[in-house]
C-alpha cells in the first residue's frame, strides 16, 4: 500500500512510520513531481508495479469494503472500476448539498446522454489497469478531474469500464482541499469531451 506525501512536514509521515512495524505492506513515497493531488496520484501510478492500481484519498471517506469487489471486476477484465455512490447499494452521507447535487447530475447526464458506462463521474475512488495507465497520456492539470479523464479515455479506446456500489462518508476530522469553483472548470472540460467520446 503506497502512501504518497508532498513534504517531510506532512503529519501523515510519522503516523505511517509508527504503523510500518505492524503493517509492513505500508510504503511511504514522497511526491517529487510537484505539490498537489494530481502529482501525488501520478507518483503513485509511476511507482506502483501491480497489475491494478487503486486510488483513494487518505481522509477516510471511501469505504474499504468496496475494494475486494472492485478487484474482482478488474480481474474479470475491467480497465476502470469506479466506486459508485449512485447505484443500488451505494450512497453518500454528508457533504455540501450543492456539491452532491452537481455530482449526481453530472453522473446521471453522462450515463444517460453521454453513454458513459458508470453512474458516478466525479468520484476519485477508482481502480485502473496497468494496461490503461501505460497506454494513455495524462492531460489533467488540476487533479481531481483525473478520474473522469481516465474513464473517458478508457471508453474511447474500447476498454471495459465497470462500477461497484460504495458508500461515501463525509470526513469527521480535518479540512477538505476540494474547492468546487476552482475544480469545476477542469471537470467541465472532460464532461464535454465525454459527450464526444467514440471508440477509437
Where on the chain are the PLM-derived regions?
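Short beta-strand/loop segment that forms part of the nucleotide-sugar
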Residues: 1-8, 27-31
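Hydrophobic helical membrane-anchoring modules
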Residues: 5, 21, 113-115, 139-200
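A conserved acidic beta->alpha catalytic loop
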Residues: 5-13, 60
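Alpha-helical transmission elements in cytosolic ATPase-linked domains
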Residues: 11, 15-18, 43, 69
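Terminal low-complexity segments of carbohydrate-biosynthetic enzymes
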Residues: 14-15, 75-76, 131, 189-200
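Short helix-capping segments at alpha-helix termini
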Residues: 20-26
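Acceptor/aglycone-binding surface of glycosyltransferases and processive sugar-polymer synthases
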Residues: 29-47, 52-55, 64-144, 170-181, ...
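Residue-level signature of catalytic and energy-coupling elements of molecular machines
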Residues: 44, 59, 129, 154, ...
Amino acid at each position: 500500500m503506497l502512501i504518497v506525501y508532498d513534504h517531510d512536514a506532512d503529519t501523515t509521515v510519522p503516523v505511517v512510520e509508527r504503523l510500518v512495524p505492524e503493517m509492513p505492506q505500508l510504503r511511504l513515497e514522497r511526491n517529487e513531481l510537484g505539490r498537489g493531488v494530481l502529482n501525488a496520484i501520478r507518483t503513485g501510478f509511476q511507482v506502483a508495479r501491480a497489475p491494478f492500481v487503486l486510488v483513494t484519498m487518505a481522509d477516510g471517506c471511501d469505504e474499504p469494503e468496496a475494494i475486494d469487489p472492485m478487484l474482482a471486476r478488474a480481474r474479470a477484465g475491467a480497465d476502470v472500476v469506479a466506486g459508485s455512490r449512485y447505484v443500488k447499494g451505494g450512497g453518500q452521507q454528508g457533504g455540501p448539498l450543492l456539491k452532491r447535487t452537481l455530482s449526481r447530475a453530472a453522473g446521471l447526464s453522462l450515463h444517460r446522454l453521454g453513454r458513459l458506462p458508470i453512474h458516478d463521474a466525479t468520484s476519485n475512488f477508482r481502480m485502473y489497469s496497468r494496461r490503461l495507465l501505460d497506454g494513455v497520456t495524462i492531460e489533467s492539470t488540476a487533479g481531481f478531474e483525473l478520474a473522469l479523464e481516465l474513464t473517458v479515455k478508457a471508453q474511447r479506446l474500447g476498454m471495459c469500464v465497470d462500477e461497484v456500489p460504495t458508500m461515501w462518508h463525509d470526513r469527521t476530522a480535518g479540512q477538505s482541499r476540494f474547492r468546487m469553483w476552482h475544480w469545476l472548470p477542469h471537470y467541465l472540460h472532460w464532461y464535454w469531451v465525454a459527450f464526444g467520446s467514440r471508440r477509437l
